[in-house]
Amino acid sequence: MTSKTILWSIEKNQQLLETRGVSFEDVVSAMERNGVLDDIPHPNQLRYAHQRVLIIEIEGYACHVLYVVDGDTMFLKTIFPSRKAQRLILRRNDDEVEN
């Protein structure tokens, strides 16, 4: 998906693995498998104008991955599951079944 170098905090990655059962390695794997559903600006542009949000399917569930880009580097900030984005996955899967 990207030719950028992808970086993240080791401590944050460990915290996400312990608290949410998902890691930045899962994000990279999903990106390699074309699991990126969307790439949007952060919804709060006043406060986080520099951030973007990847919507990624990880193990069948949609997650938001907040990140920033600095030159050729993509720095992953956090991951959280998204019920709203999950509905998009379900709708997409329903459309595929119908076709």
Segment roles from a protein language model:
Residues 1-99:
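Ribonuclease/tRNase effector modules and their secretory precursors
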